[in-house]
Amino acid sequence: AVSLEMWDAVEEALLAFSKDENVRVVILSGAGGKSFVSGADISKFESERGSKDAVDHYNARIKIVYNIIENFAKPTIAMINGYCIGGGLNLAACTDFRIVSDKSQFAMPAAKLALGYPFDAVKRLINAIGPAEARMLMFTAKRIDAPTALRLGFVQDVVAEDQLESRVMEVAEMIAQNAPLTVAAMKYISTQAMKTQPDSDGLKKCDEMVAACFASDDYIEGRQAFMEKRKPNFTGK
């Protein structure tokens, strides 16, 4: 379960990763092998969410972290092994894609706890699996298994538990070997493309990021590597 202190730690780590040029992919996972995130720490509801002011503070705090993950400039992967419940489902939906073990389970139990589920979280779930399936999951508060999550499109790969880490690392390494500027541009542009009406500043930045790819040293390196039939050595410059 996640407490307010843990959300603070996640934000701190992500800010450090964003500044580290050696970090090209960020993998989010749960410790202990039993869950990704099994939801908020109910034992701390009284202290962290026991009053309107406390609820407002908690929601504002975690919204910041969700937005940081969702808009993180570098690719993010959720490595899920076990329970992915409530806030964990929302957290996973903030990442670019999700690779899970076959023992993983998913649920949004807000309706069983009389919790409000905010607009941003509902929108992420709808973006991931569509409105009808999102409503089914939210209204019933039922759990679904990994194959069902794959069928719905919430997760992109399901593997045996003992193969999960190696599979995630395989995908992360494939991404890390590609041109960082191009990957960053594709991530930003795909985020803009999902908006109902992208703003003019966002579209301008899309054009600028594409132009930066063609003006980069990596573009020269990519062409040379292709002609020389070798793997390119991209630097992100």
Whereabouts are the PLM-identified features?
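Conserved CoA-thioester-binding segment of acyl-CoA-metabolizing enzymes
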Residues: A1-S29, N67
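Catalytic-core regions built around general acid/base machinery
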Residues: A13, H57, R61-F72
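Short, active-site-adjacent cap segments at secondary-structure transitions
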Residues: G33-V37, C84-G86, A107, S190
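Short, flexible, mixed-charge acidic loops at enzyme active sites
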Residues: S38-K44, D201
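A short acidic, glycine-rich active-site loop
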Residues: S47-A60
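Crotonase-fold acyl-CoA enzyme core
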Residues: I68-L181, S216, E221, R230
